[in-house]
């Protein structure tokens, strides 16, 4: 009888331990173990992602990124009509991490789209890591919703598509893969001297849809819950330029900074007539802790480029080109 009682107590103990262990499994949104490289890890299923989202993407450095510009919107800042590639580009980026995929992204939404998309993402298990403005004084008002998730790639993509379906974001049939090189030179397609801007910045970019896009990666690895996020997953300073009338350009984007760089960059931009329009986070559980500073400039190409170069210098970013 005593032996039976002892066995019963042991079994109850095992059940309690097993039950408690269910709450110790790390999920996206809680502390996780450091990233591991499993030789048997599955490969990112880009075909399944394409089919789920309804649009093709671009694979680079093990990241599959799908761009979804809001070409349906006509947004103006004062008298400047924004090209989609300047400040209206929704995107999601997928990366394989062990036997699961991780996703993060930035969804461009009108004010009336925010509530239904936010609610749908929550119900589908996709995390919202930030909701904020990037611009000031734009019409109509545009908001930016940052998302993150971890799990099966196709399932993550289908959940995001379910939220996008509540917006007017153009998707349609599977699109041709982006990144095709225009037959025009950068200056011809952009309508301004894109090469001059790149020389001043000390970093090369690309012209797409009439917009010069320059990406400047941070020097240190960026992680979220132990998973490394490459620059293409929104972890690089983004500087975008478009023509804005005779002899002028408009520029916007965001500086990706650690806390000790924030005040120095703010000062550098202000001294060159560049307006800071937002300062906030994009991630939760990020390491190091990052701050994203958005800006707006409308002046000659040379003046704007010099101002943004001063911002990069304040971050002690080394030029990539001469």
PLM features: what roles do these ranges have?
Residues 32-141, 148-290, 294-322:
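Long, contiguous binding/interaction regions
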Residues 27-31:
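Boundary at the C-terminal end of the N-terminal hydrophobic targeting segment
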Residues 14-26:
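Bacterial N-terminal signal peptides
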Residues 2-17:
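Bacterial N-terminal signal peptides that target proteins for export
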């Amino acid at each position: 009888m005593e032996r039976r009682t002892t066995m019963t107590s042991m079994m109850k103990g095992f059940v309690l331990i097993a039950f408690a262990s269910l709450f110790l499994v790390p999920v996206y949104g809680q502390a996780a173990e450091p990233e591991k490289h499993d030789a048997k890890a599955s490969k990112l299923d880009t075909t399944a992602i394409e089919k789920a989202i309804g649009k093709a993407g671009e694979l680079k450095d093990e990241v599959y990124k799908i761009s979804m510009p809001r070409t349906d919107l006509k947004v103006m800042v004062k008298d400047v009509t924004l090209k989609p590639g300047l400040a209206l580009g929704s995107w999601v980026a997928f990366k394989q991490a062990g036997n699961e995929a991780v996703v993060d992204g930035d969804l461009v939404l009108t004010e009336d789209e925010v509530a239904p998309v936010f609610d749908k993402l929550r119900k589908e298990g996709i995390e919202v890591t930030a909701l904020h403005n990037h611009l000031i004084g734009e019409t109509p008002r545009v908001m930016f919703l940052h998302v993150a998730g971890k799990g099966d790639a196709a399932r993550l993509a289908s959940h995001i598509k379910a939220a996008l379906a509540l917006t007017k974001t153009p998707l349609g049939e599977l699109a041709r893969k982006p990144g095709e090189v225009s037959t025009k030179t950068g200056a011809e397609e952009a309508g301004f001297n894109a090469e001059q801007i790149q020389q001043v910045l000390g970093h090369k970019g690309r012209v797409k849809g009439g917009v010069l896009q320059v990406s400047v990666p941070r020097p240190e690895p960026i992680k979220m819950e132990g998973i490394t996020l490459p620059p293409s997953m929104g972890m690089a300073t983004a500087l975008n330029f478009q023509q804005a009338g005779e002899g002028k350009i408009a520029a916007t984007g965001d500086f990706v900074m650690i806390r000790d760089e924030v005040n120095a960059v703010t000062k550098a931009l202000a001294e060159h007539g560049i307006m800071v329009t937002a300062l906030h986070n994009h991630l939760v559980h990020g390491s190091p802790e990052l701050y994203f500073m958005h800006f707006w400039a409308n002046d000659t190409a040379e003046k704007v480029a010099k101002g943004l170069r001063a911002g990069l210098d304040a971050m002690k970013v080394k030029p990539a080109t001469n």
